[in-house]
Amino acid sequence: MDIKEYFKYDFKSAVVVFLVALPLCLGIALASGAPLFAGIITGIVGGIVVGLLSKSPLSVSGPAAGLTTIVLAAITDLGYEAFLVAVILAGVIQIVAGFLRAGAIGHFFPASVLKGMLAAIGIILILKQIPHAVGYDVDFEGDQSFFQNDGQNTLSELMEAWEYLTPGAIVVSIFSVIVMTLWASNSLQRYAFFRTIPSALIAVVGGVLLNTLFVHAFPDFVITEKHLVNVPTLKEEGSILAFFTFPDFSQILNQKVLIVAFTIAAVASLETLLNIEASDKIDPFRRITPLNRELKAQGVANLISGAIGGLPLTSVVVRSSANIQSGARTKASTITHGLILLLSVILIPRILQLIPLSALAGILFVTGFKLTKPAIYKEMYKNGWSQFLPFIATVLAIVFTNLLLGVFIGILVAVFFILKTNFRESVILVSEGNNFLLRLTKDVSFLNKATFRDLFIGIPSNSSITIDGSQSHFIDHDVRETIKDFMETSKAKNIQVHLKHIEI
């Protein structure tokens, strides 16, 4: 696609992604025990570096909520400077993995699981943003795990939030949702103004203006500083270097550093592959991202991020889905969002500090709903149980655990149905009177052993069975042994067994 031709769409999307990414970068840095500016660095590198090197048209990268536990433990154990060495090494490992074509792993994620992951992220966005929408900002922005670092969980946090309602925050979040919803309506999208200006920007500006009105006219509704975006600012000219932390390379051979590096590389790569596959699923142009190239791009970005004091990064579904839903066409939106993030924290940090978190919660509400619309569940149900059950298992598992564990559980359920289908379709048994024909229709592995035993048990006495392997190129040794055993036991039941294209 021509980047120049579609830049008007990409710029609008970049603004939306920037507004979504800003609090997530800060929240994940806070939860990881890292300097707040480390989250900003990671978001900038994820946008610009990955955007330039990756072939993904719509994926957006940044600090990952799924790594916060690993990062927090590593920083506590190693110290931040040594941890940065681990991030650099993790990047190197990812680059090597890309050259070794490890990206092929991403092709093995079932579609039902990927769709379940997207729907689960939508539910999590809605549930996790409710406390922020009502003015209870204890849990960090971007948390996706059911069990939180503050001892609460997603559901108990909702109960807790109702005891700390902030009227002004509620008004702003409702205003944000209304703006986002009406702006997307067909009646308004007919006009160029509404197609050009991002609704998320209006929601945020409106939230800032509402809080300004509260300050001057409705003091009981004022949203205080702790419920606003907290962006680090320069206290004195020339102090920008104070925001950067540099790695301690004397720790490069530290065994603990190496273990953390491999752990980060493995988890970050897996999350990236999952998120890339999921993003490709909702790309309206159905483009396919080269996964090995993506691993290399992520590796280079992690290397750079670690070198200048940033956190490990991955492709992130929340940012990517916001990008796609806002109408992005090319990766220019990803790069532009990184540039906006860079320029805004340098030039207008004081203005960013006026943004209510509840305004951003409204934006994420709408993003979450689009990911988990009822129509998605209806569609998966129509596709049959073999698609719906892995889908719904993935949704529930992710919502009540975390992303990676939930996906793993979903894959197990999907594999069960794959094996069940394979058992059913690999052999066909037909009969006419006491004459049976057992035809092997595809390659038969040891997994089919139980199927053969069950079929053989059902063959009645004084009958005849022909086992035809002419359509099967491979028959596992265990299956051959099962057939051989049946030939021995069938003599007692006066069953005649004939083999066709099968050697025992």
Region spans (language model):
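Core transmembrane helix bundle of multi-pass membrane transport proteins
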Residues: M1-K12, T76-A102, G106-R286, R350-I351, ...
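Membrane-embedded helical hairpins/re-entrant loop segments and their flanking transmembrane helices
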Residues: I3-V15, V20, L24-P57, S250-A332
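Alpha-helical transmembrane segments of multipass membrane proteins
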Residues: C25-G27, G47-L52, I70, A74, ...
